[in-house]
């Protein structure tokens, strides 16, 4: 998680576990913190009634101001979320990073699921990747990055840097609204009787 503030909380009413534990081949236990992609309200408050994306002027619900994936390419002296997005954009430019893949999980009922979303400059690479996954028996669709929806990594990093910008979205019931009890097992296995 590139937004450390997001690791300090979970989304309201989600009841997500705070940590996940994995046992390695040699028997050691590795612990990973589990949080939200949204900046903790303690670190960025209050939410405005309407969030205005700085570089495009697009308006969204006020709570989206803390959603990192609505803040790209970022603002150097903006909110914490906008500063994190700016730092990522600046790092990609400074290091001349060729390709970035933003990994997401979504609820199984989400419309864009098991999909690769590609900026138009990255569509050839994404097409080949999706085809290779399909040949391996992994179902994946290809979606174009919407030109008119701003703040998203695959749109803004593709527009504001030279990187090939991609996002991969996979479904996991631990993100779903219809799930049952949420624990470490559900997060790791993605198995829930409600799905």
Language-model-detected regions and their locations in the chain:
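C-terminal accessory segments enriched in acidic
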Residues: 76, 80-195
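Active-site/substrate-binding loop(s) of hydrolase catalytic cores
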Residues: 2-120
